[in-house]
């Protein structure tokens, strides 16, 4: 019996090594740089021990580091838009009657573009480790944990599900320094589609006050 078990182990061969997480994230960064746009439906879940869990959905369109539109269908009307010069944060669901206008940061890691957070020079910015093989919406994904080397970055850990076909993120779990955990899941991803400039234009509705910060 012992001899049989030993023979079976020999036939099975040595255990397969995990993929190199640094190579995976660098490959994802190259794929990200190669596309001209990223479009997807998103589901966002923010978990906070103080305020509970907040779930939202919508559509995200991103083109380069400085142009992004997150337009929410739930809550309807909310939007975060980067137009190349400013970040517009419009949340009538919680703060009606005003829109915040912020100057665009020079470092994309400090703006709302979470893809740029993760995929801008990741080998230099983060320590990485391979977590597991998984699936997102039926697609194979490699799960990598990133820990910032720079403690001034706005999060202390990010778990990234990298699609095994196009290498781009399909899910992000970001542990922010304030204690919140934000999870973004992308479905229906399309890349390098032509995106008109109006996508990244925000026009304040009549009667809405613009608050500069």
What is the role of each PLM region?
Residues 59-111, 182-183:
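An acidic-aromatic
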Residues 114-117, 123-207, 211-213:
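Gly/Pro-enriched, hydrophobic low-complexity segments
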Residues 40-42, 55-60, 174, 184-186:
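Extended beta-sheet lipid-handling architectures
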Residues 45-48, 75, 151, 179:
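Hydrophobic lipid-interacting interfaces of membrane-associated proteins
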Residues 5-54, 65, 204-213:
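N-terminal leader/targeting segments and the immediate start of mature chains
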Residues 35-37, 55-57, 63-67, 75, ...:
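Extracytoplasmic
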Residues 22-25, 29, 112-116, 159:
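Extracytoplasmic/secreted envelope proteins and their assembly/folding machinery
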Residues 42, 68-72, 87-90, 146, ...:
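Short hydrophobic/aromatic-rich beta-strand segments that constitute the beta-sheet cores
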């Amino acid at each position: 019996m012992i001899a049989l078990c030993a023979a079976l182990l020999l036939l099975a061969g040595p255990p397969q090594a995990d993929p190199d997480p640094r190579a995976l994230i660098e490959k994802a960064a190259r794929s990200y740089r190669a596309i001209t746009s990223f479009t997807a439906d998103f589901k966002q879940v923010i978990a906070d021990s103080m305020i509970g869990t907040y779930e939202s959905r919508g559509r995200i369109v991103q083109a380069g580091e400085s142009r992004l539109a997150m337009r929410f269908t739930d809550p309807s009307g909310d939007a975060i838009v980067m137009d190349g010069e400013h970040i517009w944060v419009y949340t009538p669901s919680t703060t009606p009657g005003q829109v915040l206008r912020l100057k665009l940061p020079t470092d994309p890691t400090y703006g709302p573009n979470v893809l740029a957070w993760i995929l801008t020079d990741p080998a230099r910015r983060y320590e990485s480790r391979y977590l597991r093989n998984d699936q997102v919406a039926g697609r194979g994904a490699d799960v990598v944990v990133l820990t910032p080397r720079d403690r001034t970055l706005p999060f202390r850990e990010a778990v990234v599900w990298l699609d095994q076909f196009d290498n781009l993120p399909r899910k992000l779990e970001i542990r922010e320094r304030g204690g919140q955990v934000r999870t973004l899941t992308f479905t229906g991803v399309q890349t390098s589609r032509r995106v008109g400039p109006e996508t990244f234009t925000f026009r304040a509705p009549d009667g809405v006050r613009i608050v500069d910060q």
